[in-house]
């Protein structure tokens, strides 16, 4: 929580007011990521095969914990798709732990598909890669060959409850969030 002095309470000689300072609400940035499963090959160009809304952490210096809220808004593919998050600029040696709040049970079940390791983060390489889910349809309760289009328009099955995954990354050493925010690399994968 940031606290700012009340308007007009700052003077050249410094802040010396006895008034209670104003509380400033921290606003989180929300971005949408839309994926086409055939990229870079030609596809149907609708960019609805996986649609994620992502709430990013607030900016700041010396941050030791990053919290992301990821909503799976639509699934427009009829094949198994998973999604992951690579965070460029965070060495895995600096990661104390990655844990999950809401959506953790569905995430774990969907990782049995084999697209990603069934772990908090991938063990290969030096960069932090977090599997978000291994099967978008499984997240919404579809199994086997059941792969309907979800929440993509008139001919699809509407979603009444949107799946949300909360991802918490705890670091050993503090970092600056703006550099990490620029390094986000959301991606999709399939078998």
Set out the residue ranges of the language-model regions.
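Extracellular distal adhesion/interaction modules in secreted or cell-surface proteins
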Residues: 1-191
């Amino acid at each position: 929580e940031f606290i700012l002095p009340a308007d007009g309470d700052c003077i050249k000689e410094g802040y010396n007011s006895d008034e209670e300072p104003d509380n400033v609400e921290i606003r989180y940035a929300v971005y949408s990521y839309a994926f086409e499963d055939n990229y870079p090959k030609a596809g149907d160009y609708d960019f609805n095969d996986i649609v994620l809304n992502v709430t990013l952490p607030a900016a700041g210096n010396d941050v030791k914990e990053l919290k992301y809220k990821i909503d799976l808004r639509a699934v427009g593919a009829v094949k198994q798709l998973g999604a992951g998050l690579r965070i460029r600029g965070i060495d895995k040696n600096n990661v104390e732990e990655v844990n999950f709040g809401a959506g953790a049970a569905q995430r774990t079940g969907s990782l049995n598909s084999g697209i990603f390791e069934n772990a908090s983060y991938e063990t290969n390489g030096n960069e932090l890669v977090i599997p978000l889910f291994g099967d978008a349809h499984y997240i919404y309760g579809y199994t086997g060959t059941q792969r309907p289009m979800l929440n993509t328009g008139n001919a699809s099955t509407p979603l009444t409850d949107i799946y949300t995954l909360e991802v918490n990354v705890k670091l050993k050493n503090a970092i600056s969030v703006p550099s990490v925010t620029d390094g986000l690399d959301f991606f999709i994968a399939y078998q």
